[in-house]
């Protein structure tokens, strides 16, 4: 009888120890579930391409993160950090926004196929351009055409056709300063995004959520 009691108490001790192990395991599982704020940070990191850590190290503005989430976007690249808009940029008879190759912060935003297309398109008498999307500071998306151009021995990319729709919104004024970014939407399509303009050291409102 005494041996039986000892065995019974030993089994109870083992059962209690096992229960503690299970309880600790459950607590660990609960602690390992990321909070909403942690999930948001994770989402932001996932916007950066694994093969371009330098992009992740640079500061991705909040407005661009919102735009990219809306488009399931990824691979953000700062194309031009400080683009001062001039009179010709806002003239509808010009109908394009230019980006001088010498002013580009990043020149690897095009795929090999896109680069080849633009090079071949440049040789045509009438250039078709590469169909891309442009997101303005009010988060409206426009269809525009990216072309390669050589004017006065200066190589540049231009966003044409749909640019006049942006002009019509009267978001920009002469001497406004903007940033130009690129990214890929969920289908891999090339997109450009424009920051809200800065005027006299102040940023105008834009990029609604």
UniProtKB/Swiss-Prot annotation:
Coiled coil: none
Localization in the cell: Nucleus
InterPro entries: At2g31720-like, B3_DNA-bd, DNA-bd_pseudobarrel_sf
Xref: SUPFAM superfamilies: DNA-binding pseudobarrel domain
Annotation: DNA-binding region: 101-198
Gene3D superfamilies per record: DNA-binding pseudobarrel domain
A Pfam family matched in the record: At2g31720-like
Primary localisation category: nucleus
Protein name: B3 domain-containing protein At2g31420
The organism of origin for this protein: Arabidopsis thaliana
Organism placement in taxonomy: Eukaryota, Viridiplantae, Streptophyta, Embryophyta, Tracheophyta
């Amino acid at each position: 009888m005494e041996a039986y009691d000892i065995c019974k108490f030993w089994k109870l001790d083992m059962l209690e120890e096992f229960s503690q192990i299970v309880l600790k395991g459950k607590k660990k599982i609960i602690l390992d579930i990321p909070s909403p704020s942690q999930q948001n940070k994770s989402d932001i990191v996932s916007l950066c391409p694994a093969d371009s850590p330098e992009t992740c190290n640079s500061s991705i503005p909040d407005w661009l993160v919102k735009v990219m989430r809306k488009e399931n976007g990824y691979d953000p690249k700062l194309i031009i950090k400080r683009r001062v808009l001039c009179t010709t940029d806002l003239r509808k008879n010009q109908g394009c926004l230019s980006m001088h190759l010498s002013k580009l912060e990043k020149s690897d935003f095009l795929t090999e196929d896109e680069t080849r297309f633009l090079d071949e398109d440049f040789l045509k008498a009438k250039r078709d351009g590469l169909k891309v999307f442009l997101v303005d500071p009010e988060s409206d998306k426009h269809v525009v055409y990216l072309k390669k151009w050589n004017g006065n021995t200066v190589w540049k990319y231009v966003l044409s056709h749909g640019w006049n729709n942006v002009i019509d919104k009267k978001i920009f004024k002469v001497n406004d300063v903007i940033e130009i970014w690129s990214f890929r939407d969920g289908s891999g399509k090339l997109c450009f995004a424009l920051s809200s303009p800065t005027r006299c050291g102040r940023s105008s409102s834009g990029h609604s959520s």
